[in-house]
């Protein structure tokens, strides 16, 4: 067969297969064109569920006579002209396919009058004849698009249309989404001559709440929490409901990116995760959320219906949404505190340590496997019987004696497993009825790994440490010697002028963290949290935070008191940035309260730094030579001439004289 260029009519009908799925698709494209034209009033008339008639009238800028025929041509648009325009797109439409595709499967009349014309003009075309017929007509400033007999020339497509009631329900739901995205636009919907919906323009908060109540119901308004947050060019605002406003189906989930309706799986995953600890498996969150960001940071041209986008900084967007919602839910009085960092429940191996002084920027690239995993992820929320937790690695026993404090390990493993068990009903059994009900298998290990790759934030890495070397010393004091080899995977053999010595890397790790937390020379710099962490505590713990507020501030831990039983964590030092603050801060306040009566210790920040170092430092099963060199190099730089060489659990001399004697 020879290769030929497709006729324009056939090409448009093929394109219509993607653009025009059902009458609601036509309404979506035409209403979005009205919004792009600056309309503040849109009237929609539907007959027979849209199969007989779809008429959209607006008061937008209109189309001049000379461009009416061109507007019905394929790939003709006023929205973009260059690639730069596409990369900075803010309009809802930009492909120039909608009108041509719709006219190829219907009888379409386009009537318009811009403010610069005294006469309105009408363009008519239908599927079999792509010729456009122009004629003068009467029309106010704005545009009217009339679509008659949808799919009249494609019987196979028309046969797949549902009942009139079903098709109109899709149109009604679509207009609800549009009404929530543009509170400043009046929208009227009629079906078979009867007014069904009338959304009046909202110009203040009270009117906006009325529209919310009209679309989402009074129950949503009673249980809603207002969200408004901005960080690093990202802005999130809108409303979410407390768990009391949870639904039995996902019918009140509306999300918008730069004003565009979205069903993006990355966004949905962040929202699901923020509600994970507060909703039952059969419950669904309800929300109306708006995400705004630089259009250069998002690609909207990745989905035929524009329902999904790709974020250039997907990790940042995901964590921003998750922490914003989790913090808002934690601050509400109706639920317990959600666990912000579940990865802290399990021991995890430490990643490779970068060279000292290296501060690599966090990569925002999301591997393709992540998107594949998200595509195959089970529907929200996690169903009973589905296992999604990564298997924990058993923590190592501490090498520290009981006299030196608590073990360097995560909080009690059994308690955390019990907590996770209580949040995952029937996690060990999955009945056949459940499989039939949900119809989706649990994610595979590869999918879970891909999720972890997207969401995992490693425990505090050494490359993010803010070191405070003494300004009086030009270079670190080399007292630990030259590294030779790692012995028994956890000890480093070094050589000095005095001979050989063995260094415990686990103990060195403790002193490294202690050096980072030691604020004797200068107060530690506090790093503000992306979203302040709200904690509900006992009165005694809040009192301890107030009593030792200056002491905590010197360590870079900043609190803001809410009331006698609640406070907010505003900032922490770099070594604590990636810790599970939801667990660590209450324990720290308990420690401070217990030491209050010991006057000398209460005034000594070193004791608190030692306690924190024991909690934060991690014990590894084995170290590489490069990791060992990194640890002792930072140790020497942090401690300078004050290296704790007197600690026998840190360093001990090794005498090879007897061994050498046997060889001679």
Swiss-Prot record:
One of its GO terms (molecular function) is mismatched DNA binding. The keyword Cell wall biogenesis/degradation does not apply. The keyword Endoplasmic reticulum does not apply. Pfam families: DNA_mis_repair (PF01119), HATPase_c_3 (PF13589), MutL_C (PF08676). Residues 427-436 have a biased composition (Polar residues). It comes from the Bacteria. Residues 382-447 are annotated as: Disordered. One of its GO terms (cellular component) is mismatch repair complex. InterPro entries: DNA_mismatch_repair_CS, DNA_mismatch_repair_MutL, DNA_mismatch_S5_2-like, HATPase_C_sf, MutL/Mlh/PMS, MutL/Mlh/Pms-like, MutL_C, MutL_C_dimsub. PANTHER family: DNA MISMATCH REPAIR PROTEIN MLH, PMS, MUTL, DNA MISMATCH REPAIR PROTEIN MLH1. This is DNA mismatch repair protein MutL. It comes from Vibrio vulnificus (strain YJ016). The gene is mutL.
